[in-house]
A protein has these predicted regions:
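Alpha-helical secondary-structure segments
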Residues: 112-118, 162-166, 242-243, 291-311
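Short, well-ordered beta-strand elements
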Residues: 33-46, 84, 94-97, 116-119, ...
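Surface-exposed binding/hinge segments that line
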Residues: 133-190
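N-terminal lobe/hinge region of extracytoplasmic solute-binding protein
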Residues: 41-90
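Gly/Pro-rich hinge or "lid" segments in bacterial periplasmic/extracellular proteins
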Residues: 169-238, 243
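C-terminal motif of bacterial Sec signal peptides marking the signal peptidase cleavage site
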Residues: 20-22
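Aromatic- and charge-enriched surface segment that lines or borders ligand/interaction sites
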Residues: 84-132, 303
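Ligand-site clamp/hinge motif
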Residues: 232-275
Length: 311
């Protein structure tokens, strides 16, 4: 695959040789045989709505079925996706993106600059209640919109024609390009969302896709589904896998047993299994980016208001 979208989010996995070949081969020769990957999640996904997702399982799916201005390639290097060219002003506060003209949604609609404008305004609108809307901070008027002091239309983003997008920042953001590869900033199809109403993104059939895969079979609560190659994806020739079969497996021991029996192409390992299997065929370690924290409930337990106690 052109991007590393399907690499495991866990630090340690066991993967079969066939899996690694399907996900990581850079060969210009493509096999005539259809390629299927049997993968797993450690938790249920909750939504396909990039504006409302907060969990890793949902973001893994969104990253594979949707696409933004950039994607993360090898070694997490930012590379162009929907953006064909980018200009940044001398003061670092104005970004201009040219969007590729051959990108389409799975319903046939073209992906345009207006899809980004709509998406960002929808996400940052307090009515949407996006838990990650704070990530827009630094974009012109974002903080004021989140706090309800300004309307979403005041956000520093505009479409200059069908395929040119301009973003205005309040200050230089050194990690801005990296931020644009996060699903929260992906485009959204306004016509489709308004047609679906409250059903939007609650199951596979209530979703429209512009990424390398389409999701099928997720009802909103079941524990297995598939990704299938998206025939309308602009770079479909670079997508090596035809199908990815997902299932939710919550315990490492179950993962490993299914892997051993050939029912999974990879398995997440717990600390004990890591020690015993380290160095064996298929054992793989990958760095992961994560933030963990503890949050004190000061309403239920007022004693936690004492900062000395918390320390």
């Amino acid at each position: 695959m052109r991007s590393k979208r399907l690499l495991a989010s866990s630090a340690v996995i066991l993967a079969s040789a066939a899996t690694l070949a399907a996900c990581g081969s850079n060969s210009s020769q493509s096999s005539a045989k259809k390629q299927t990957l049997t993968w797993m999640n450690t938790a249920e996904m909750t939504t396909l709505d990039a504006s409302k997702a907060t969990d890793g399982a949902s973001y893994e799916q969104i990253n594979n079925v949707e696409e933004g201005l950039y994607l993360l390639g090898k070694n997490a290097k930012v590379q162009n996706a929907l953006a064909t060219s980018t200009k940044n002003s001398a003061d670092g506060k104005t970004w201009t993106f040219t969007i590729r003209k051959d990108a389409k949604w799975s319903n046939g609609d073209p992906v345009t600059a207006k899809d980004f404008v709509y998406s960002w305004r929808r996400t940052i609108d307090p009515k949407t209640a996006s838990e990650y809307s704070y990530l827009f901070s630094g974009i012109k008027n974002a903080d004021a919109i989140v706090s309800g002091k300004k309307k979403p239309a005041a956000l520093g983003i505009k479409a200059d024609g069908k395929y040119k997008l301009t973003v205005t920042l309040e200050k230089r953001i050194p990690y801005f390009k990296l931020l644009m590869a996060f699903p929260l900033f992906f485009p959204q199809n306004q016509k489709f969302i308004e047609k679906m109403g409250s059903k939007y993104a609650t199951s596979s059939k209530y979703m429209v896709y512009n990424g390398p895969f389409k999701q099928v079979g997720w009802t909103g609560s079941n524990l297995s589904w598939k990704l299938v190659k998206n025939p309308t994806y602009w770079d479909k020739k670079s997508v090596k896998l035809d199908t990815v079969k997902f299932s939710v497996q919550k315990t490492p021991s179950t993962d490993y047993n299914l892997y051993q029996s050939g029912k999974l192409d990879a398995a997440f390992l717990d600390a004990q299994a890591t020690k015993s299997l380290k160095g064996k065929t298929g054992y793989t370690q990958r760095k992961m980016s994560t933030t963990q924290y503890l949050s004190y409930n000061t309403k239920k337990h007022p004693e936690f208001k004492n900062k000395n106690l918390r320390l």
